[in-house]
C-alpha cells in the first residue's frame, strides 16, 4: 500500500467556510500535508482531471460545480493513505456516510460532497502529479 493520496476540498466546502475544519480533520486523522494549494479550477483543468467521467451523464454538471469557486488541492502522506483517507471522508453520498466522517458532517448531496479522495495508489500518483511538481511535495 502506498503512503500518499490526493484530496480536494471542493468549492461547496470552501464556500461554506469549512476548509479549516476539514484541515483539522486531516491532521486529527494522522495525515502529513505534503503540499496544498488554494485555486479556482479552469474548465480545461476540471475536464482534464475528471476526463474518466467524460461519458457519464453528470459530467457537465460536475465540471460546472468544480469550476464554480475556489477549492483546495492537497497531497497527503500516511501509511495506507488511500484507504485511510477514504475511511476519513466517508461514502460518496453523504446520506450513506458513517457518522463523524467528513462527508456526513460537511456535505449536502452526492455531487456537492465536500471532498474528493483518490480511489487507488495508482490514481493518487496521477492526481498528485496533475496539480503538483515533484519539488512542491514535502515528505514527512
Residue ranges of each PLM-predicted region?
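Non-catalytic terminal and connector segments of soluble metabolic enzymes
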Residues: 1-140
Amino acid at each position: 500500500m502506498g503512503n500518499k493520496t490526493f484530496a480536494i476540498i471542493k468549492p461547496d466546502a470552501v464556500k461554506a467556510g469549512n476548509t479549516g475544519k476539514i484541515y483539522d480533520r486531516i491532521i486529527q486523522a494522522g495525515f502529513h500535508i505534503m503540499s496544498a494549494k488554494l485555486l479556482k479550477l479552469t474548465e480545461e483543468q476540471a475536464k482534464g482531471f475528471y476526463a474518466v467521467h467524460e461519458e457519464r451523464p453528470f459530467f457537465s454538471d460536475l465540471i460546472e460545480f468544480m469550476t464554480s469557486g475556489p477549492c483546495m488541492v492537497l497531497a497527503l502522506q500516511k501509511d495506507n493513505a488511500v484507504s485511510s483517507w477514504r475511511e476519513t471522508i466517508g461514502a460518496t453520498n453523504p446520506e450513506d456516510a458513517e457518522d463523524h466522517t467528513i462527508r456526513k458532517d460537511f456535505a449536502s448531496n452526492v455531487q456537492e460532497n465536500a471532498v474528493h479522495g483518490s480511489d487507488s495508489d495508482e490514481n493518487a500518483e496521477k492526481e498528485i502529479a496533475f496539480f503538483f511538481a515533484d519539488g512542491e511535495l514535502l515528505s514527512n
